[in-house]
């Protein structure tokens, strides 16, 4: 398709479960992207994990051809985006390739915090946002209330928002009609030198690196020599094409289009996401503004159960980072667990997903340590350092001040659950910043310590509000706090992988809880196992896993008490000797016991 005015690039912004992937299925069906027999629910969620959890993790792209009612054939390039708070970076990447976005809102549930955050990102990037009310067929749908909410909370006009039901297909054609009228056509020139933005890359064992690109200017075809701006390397293009939704090769990709380029790049870091591609004959083309690199919020150690898997693990991480640019990792070693990597994630869900992908796609057995956030330390020497691993914390006598990261959290909650949410925020050491009443919903803004938010805040928020509250947060600042390092000792030996940094007020409580939890998880040995929690040299909690013991008196049948005592003493001496040389196997669950502490 040659005419730029007939191309529309758009993505869908929606909260989890508001029907985004189902609407995408309807678009594909209506535009004849797949035959009836190939249609399945959530076509674009191609990862098994995405289907099981019912969430979109990666951004996907599809090119569809839609003939409008006025007879014009439009090329729709649709980039699917995730809705969960941990994957906002995927959203900003997708939006960088679009001119417009559909804001899909569940007509029963109304606006949720995550859609608000993503919608603002779209507006900041200058996109045209078009509201769509989905699930209009449900009995609890209340379109008028939701339209009012969109106007009040997000501030865009929703009086004539399109109403549809992606599940039944009702009104979906109207969405497409409105879309081609509302969303602007891309700008660009075929004759200019090639300038293309890499939106996503992934590694294919046969093809090498496959890059999803948005062409801004010029054109690219098979046989062209392309230059990757950041690495300065030149590659020969093997094939170009689009997804509709299957891989379909085309003769070329032109300005305004979104598609894939395969150039036989074997180096995993050969085509970084957010980079600019151009032809080798025009190397002085300007670099396109990429998207801001997202800093990880949560760090955890990942260790292979068998040390022989270390190299495979390194390779698997390299391949995953290509596809998921927000994952960061550095090698680390632990006395308890051997060699592994310290990985940075965007949140707890992201961490779980990465661990599952490593175990499934690369067949690895991993142990994960408890996640922590980054702390800022002002040392007495005057320098400032950042620590993401409790076992790397310097001696307390050399620290002038410890600061913890604070996030600004926006919570949208129905009025009847407001009390529970406020109680939860206070329990998590939150400070209220603002409260707005918007129709039946309330928007509360809290400053919360990130350490409290990343572990289980999201789950607790959902359960206290019966699933109705929604959360969006971003890092705000570092703030001084009275923090201490909580060590766990097993039989008198510190286990570095179990150390935690906690607030002093909670330390005794956390220590008691942690030792009790460990007692349940560590299996009984042939000798007593002492589990202690300590701050510095002071033991604040202790519990023991009692030894398994054989009844040595069974053969005595009455007999003299001194004979019995002799047998018991002999057993005791044996147990003592075992304890000195015995090793305690700590199961994987014990390393994650920290996550299951009720804060």
UniProtKB/Swiss-Prot annotation:
<dbReference type="InterPro" id="IPR038363">
    <property type="entry name" value="LepA_C_sf"/>
</dbReference>
<dbReference type="InterPro" id="IPR006297">
    <property type="entry name" value="EF-4"/>
</dbReference>
<dbReference type="GO" id="GO:0003924">
    <property type="term" value="F:GTPase activity"/>
</dbReference>
<dbReference type="GO" id="GO:0045727">
    <property type="term" value="P:positive regulation of translation"/>
</dbReference>
<feature type="binding site">
    <location>
        <begin position="17"/>
        <end position="22"/>
    </location>
    <ligand>
        <name>GTP</name>
    </ligand>
</feature>
<dbReference type="InterPro" id="IPR005225">
    <property type="entry name" value="Small_GTP-bd"/>
</dbReference>
<protein>
    <recommendedName>
        <fullName>Elongation factor 4</fullName>
        <ecNumber>3.6.5.n1</ecNumber>
    </recommendedName>
</protein>
<keyword id="KW-0378">Hydrolase</keyword>
<keyword id="KW-0547">Nucleotide-binding</keyword>
<keyword id="KW-0342">GTP-binding</keyword>
<dbReference type="InterPro" id="IPR035654">
    <property type="entry name" value="LepA_IV"/>
</dbReference>
<keyword id="KW-0648">Protein biosynthesis</keyword>
<dbReference type="InterPro" id="IPR013842">
    <property type="entry name" value="LepA_CTD"/>
</dbReference>
<keyword id="KW-0472">Membrane</keyword>
<feature type="binding site">
    <location>
        <begin position="134"/>
        <end position="137"/>
    </location>
    <ligand>
        <name>GTP</name>
    </ligand>
</feature>
<dbReference type="InterPro" id="IPR000795">
    <property type="entry name" value="T_Tr_GTP-bd_dom"/>
</dbReference>
<dbReference type="Pfam" id="PF03144">
    <property type="entry name" value="GTP_EFTU_D2"/>
</dbReference>
<dbReference type="Pfam" id="PF00679">
    <property type="entry name" value="EFG_C"/>
</dbReference>
<dbReference type="GO" id="GO:0043022">
    <property type="term" value="F:ribosome binding"/>
</dbReference>
<comment type="similarity">
    <text>Belongs to the TRAFAC class translation factor GTPase superfamily. Classic translation factor GTPase family. LepA subfamily.</text>
</comment>
<dbReference type="InterPro" id="IPR035647">
    <property type="entry name" value="EFG_III/V"/>
</dbReference>
<dbReference type="InterPro" id="IPR004161">
    <property type="entry name" value="EFTu-like_2"/>
</dbReference>
<dbReference type="InterPro" id="IPR027417">
    <property type="entry name" value="P-loop_NTPase"/>
</dbReference>
<keyword id="KW-1003">Cell membrane</keyword>
<dbReference type="Pfam" id="PF06421">
    <property type="entry name" value="LepA_C"/>
</dbReference>
<dbReference type="Pfam" id="PF00009">
    <property type="entry name" value="GTP_EFTU"/>
</dbReference>
<feature type="domain" description="tr-type G">
    <location>
        <begin position="5"/>
        <end position="187"/>
    </location>
</feature>
<dbReference type="GO" id="GO:0097216">
    <property type="term" value="F:guanosine tetraphosphate binding"/>
</dbReference>
<keyword id="KW-0997">Cell inner membrane</keyword>
<dbReference type="GO" id="GO:0005886">
    <property type="term" value="C:plasma membrane"/>
</dbReference>
<dbReference type="GO" id="GO:0003746">
    <property type="term" value="F:translation elongation factor activity"/>
</dbReference>
<dbReference type="InterPro" id="IPR000640">
    <property type="entry name" value="EFG_V-like"/>
</dbReference>
<comment type="function">
    <text>Required for accurate and efficient protein synthesis under certain stress conditions. May act as a fidelity factor of the translation reaction, by catalyzing a one-codon backward translocation of tRNAs on improperly translocated ribosomes. Back-translocation proceeds from a post-translocation (POST) complex to a pre-translocation (PRE) complex, thus giving elongation factor G a second chance to translocate the tRNAs correctly. Binds to ribosomes in a GTP-dependent manner.</text>
</comment>
<dbReference type="GO" id="GO:0005525">
    <property type="term" value="F:GTP binding"/>
</dbReference>
